[in-house]
């Protein structure tokens, strides 16, 4: 029987499917951070249960860490408690921890892949909604709740209903300067923030194959923003080249066997999806959001949409509410929207490729007057590589702030947050009301678009606003 990529991974991990109950699947990798794990570890302790698979559990500190100092004294009391509690729990259960002093510490969805923890064909879970990032490697990866975190810690399994399948094909090649962020925002703009609800999405097509692993991670990271359970890209030579030699990737004969297995991880030619969506890559322009969800997005050469043009009353009301919150007027050219904050980072866009793209726009220019711009690498490894390439100097000379790794301004959970009324060009994944701070307005863009906005003081079309020549 022909199968999709998702069905192959699902079937390989199905432990039991009791009649009338949710199936139980096996979990290969469990990623843990300081925010959603304390109650789970506490539950184990109270029940006197051991950790089922220490070697398959990996922890880091990212959500509440400071990007200005690696000292615990830089943290708020709540953040310090969470960080210290994670350290205590990892010590008590012998879990591998990448703490704030470890050179590989970073955002869980950045450091996991770069260490080779993320592998094709595996099932990966984490108490974080953007776990879908790891699907870029052909893994089935999704976020879970705290009670499920405890269940996985105790059993290395999870009750899970099987999802429907959706194929999203991006045909042809994108134009110069168009990134994975533009592709995924265009997809969400087409199908809506609930278009993928109930599905595991497989991204395919020439434009997807052309993406680097960094780009594929950006793509899958935002699968949750279209409502999908997970996003996946079938592994290929690009995947294998990225993984070879990484710390937790197979070595020697095991690597050769893994390659043979991974090359079978693709959707069979005659497999049938429950739903299919097609986009033409050449039609995708640089994207940016205008409202309060990722589906409220337009091209940079467009204008703020008018709710009066929307025939669906529910959608129209949502648009009106969003425009009132973000304080924009219908018909305003997107390039006329001024910003005063820029955030380049997050599990969506904080990898080395992202920082290179942003630095290309920043090089030889200066951050506009009245604009504060910060760059937060996604991990210690990314930070070191960027500094070895001199990217930090480019940012600093242009007037950007260069920070330590962490989730930072993606969410108003740490000290990096916006003030009421701030308007931010952000490379993160969510533009909900208050996401980056109470009363803040967020516009989601690619790293190049964010850096270009920082130096211009407003949104610009990077197809015109090109990097300066050396």
Swiss-Prot record:
GO biological process: L-leucine biosynthetic process
Protein name from the UniProt record: 3-isopropylmalate dehydratase large subunit
Gene from which the chain derives: leuC
Cofactor(s) in the UniProt record: [4Fe-4S] cluster
Cofactor note: Binds 1 [4Fe-4S] cluster per subunit.
Family, similarity comment: Belongs to the aconitase/IPM isomerase family. LeuC type 1 subfamily.
Species annotation: Shewanella amazonensis (strain ATCC BAA-1098 / SB2B)
Catalytic activity: (2R,3S)-3-isopropylmalate = (2S)-2-isopropylmalate
Function: Catalyzes the isomerization between 2-isopropylmalate and 3-isopropylmalate, via the formation of 2-isopropylmaleate.
NCBIfam families attached to this UniProt entry: leuC (TIGR00170), PRK05478.1 (NF004016), PRK12466.1 (NF009116)
Molecular function terms from GO: 3-isopropylmalate dehydratase activity; 4 iron, 4 sulfur cluster binding; metal ion binding
